[in-house]
Amino acid sequence: MCSIETPHFVIQNGRVQPRFPGGISNELADHIAAELVPLGLVRDISAFERIFVDTVLAARPDPMQAWTAFYGNTMRRLRRPERGGTGAVATFARIYAHALSLVRGATVLDVGCCFGFLPLLAAEQDPRLRVIGTDLVPATAALASRISRVHGGRARFAAADLLALPVADEAVDTVLAVHVLEHLPAGASTRALAQLRRVARYRVVIAVPLEESPDPVFGHLQAFDLPRLAGVGGFPPTPGWSRAVCAADGGWLVLDRGAPDALPDRVGTRCPN
């Protein structure tokens, strides 16, 4: 009987058994990548998602209790991230904080929101905001909706395709797409950006990881550096829009619809406020 032990998993006869006595949060993604990928147990996003979900569900006998605990652990760490931390939760806490600092207006749409941590944080931190999160996977959007109701129901969630958003033109003040574009084929970036600009009244905020090559384990289909991200934003910028590109825990593309206080068109290392 072959058995391999890592800090958070026991692999026996090809079966992965998790061990997280301190509780499971979204740091699980780091542990899968660091401990199981080198063993050849996770070769693509399908295997990653299967192990991720199975690990979360193994923590409690009731599935909803398991997901509620997962959300609770993650949200607590996002609210009080480890200073200077490099793990998934600490890194995304900084990314989410920066994204929220760029919000203009009173309505926010977060596309490709996955578990919906960013919309939940936005609704929690600013009661004045009307926040909607969308994800391509209906089950993920439904799970986020159930968790939102536990948190007062201020953030709303729906299933939607980024390439065909069921949202009227200029219907929301700020549109966020945080770590979404890298999951699209390169040829779809222009279509995605057209949808984001269409529904945004004031601003579009896009964040991507900066990579030399796409990481298939996380489902990445294209890789970005700052020049390529700037190219997605258009050069020269789309008429009526200004553009800023910068780096801060990844790459950022901020597009403002033409206005007296719109961002100047620029590409650099310092991110706008």
Specify the residue positions occupied by each region the protein language model found:
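Conserved acidic residues
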Residues: A106, D173, Y202
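Short amphipathic alpha-helix with an adjacent loop that forms part of the alpha/beta core around
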Residues: L165-E170
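Intrinsically disordered, low-complexity peptide-like regions
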Residues: V108, A171, C271-N273
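A conserved beta-strand element that flanks and buttresses the S-adenosyl-L-methionine
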Residues: L176
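S-adenosyl-L-methionine-dependent methyltransferase catalytic module, highlighting the catalytic core
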Residues: M1-A29, L163, L184-N273
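Conserved N-terminal segment of class I S-adenosyl-L-methionine
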Residues: M1-A164, T190-L193, Q222, L226-G231
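Hydrophobic adenine-recognition pocket in adenosine-nucleotide-binding enzymes
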Residues: V180
